[in-house]
Each structure stands twice: as C-alpha cells, then as structure tokens.
Amino acid sequence: TLSHSSAASDVYKRQMPHNSNGSNGQMFEVETFRGDPISIEYAEKRMRNEPVVEVTQVKGTSDTHPLLSPDDEWADFEIMDKRVGSRPPTYSMPQGGYVRDAYLRGLTLEWEGRGNPYKFGLIGSSDTHTGAGAFDENNYWSKVGVLDGIDMSRGSVPLTQDRIDLLNQYADLYDQPVSVQEIDGRTYADVGFDQWSASGLAVAWAEENTRDSIFQAFKRKETFATTGTRMAVRFFAGYDLSLIHI
C-alpha cells in the first residue's frame, strides 16, 4: 500500500479522490470492490492515504446532487451527471459519488463500529491538461486543448461543414463515430463538454510556501476548495477542539 511504501522509503505519498461525481457511485461505497464489508482496518488505511478529497473541478461539482439534497437550492450547482470517459455519455448514479453523502455514510459506518473512511478535508482542482487553469467563465479557454479549445468543439455553437468534415476524417482514422446532435436544424458536437465549467482551486493553510509545508497542510486537512474565487477563509472545527487550541 501507499502507507507501507511511505514508511519504507520516507517519501510522502498521498492519493486524492478525483471526479467522484462521475464514478457511477463507486467512489464512496459502503463495501469494498470485492463485496466485503468496510472494516476498521480499511477505514484507517484509506484515511492514511486519502486525507483530502476533490470537491470541485472542471468536470463538475462533487459536493452534492439534487437527488441527494432535495431541500438544498444550490444542490444543482455545476452538475455533471455523466460517467467519466463514457462514450456515448452515460448517466452516473449519484448515490456514492458525492462528498456530502460520503460524510453521512462515513458517520453511519463509524456508528456501526466499522470505522470512518470518509473523514475528508476538501480541495478543488482545475483538472486541465494544458499546464494552466481557466477559472473565469467569461474567459474559459479549455481543459484539454485540442479537444475543447474552440467553442465548436465544446458544443457551444453549431459546427461548420469544414469542422464536420474534419471530425469525420478523425472518425475514419480511429474507427470511432463522431457524436453529434441536431438542434433546430443545426449540428452540434455532442461530447458532454457542455456540462464542464471554469473551476476550481485548492487552498492550503501552510506555514510557508514550500512543497513540504503544503503537503503537511493536506495531511492536517487544513484545506478548502473554491470554484475559482481567490479568497482567504479560516475556520476551526473538530471533535475535541477547545478554546485553548484556538
């Protein structure tokens, strides 16, 4: 495991659950992939390896979903309801895929004596593959460059005939059909990019601007996420927190 590897090599390694909203409910299950019940050992291992979780990024928000939080008027904020990488785009089941629901699942597992594998801190991330992040909806340039770098590729405006011909050439080359949709007599790319958004940022309360100090902040879960706004927020919460700690 990562924890054993870290102990042996004295190298800091951590995993950060990514795009849980597109996991079809598999990210925060109440049993293992083998169908075994979650155990205290599993919960402890997951918390050692995964102290924080990504709650927002370009492929949607992983906070909550209208089906999970029907009384929350913001529950539909930047929802991507498709499974990551599915072709054609396929619905992703929300139960087990969103962080707020994972918190409740973790508390239930802990109450049952099986430990809490979902006691996460929060981060955001851009998930861009361009070496830069686009955090302003009014100045969004792309996530992966060649695939969504122009408005036609994202399905924001109709495809021109030249673009359709180019896509068909790629389809023939890679033996993969081009996914398009007809709206009011116009042809649009149907790639699921219309549910992407300009987001997000990870914020860490670190003692200094060094990699080690930032990683230690992740380990302490002294982090929060924004959808792109650069703000400084600090708050304190904990099971055993007292005034002397503050």
Model-assigned labels for residue ranges:
Residues 14-243:
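A post-motif C-terminal structural segment
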Residues 2-8, 12, 244-245:
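Single conserved hydrophobic/aromatic residue that forms the stacking wall/gate
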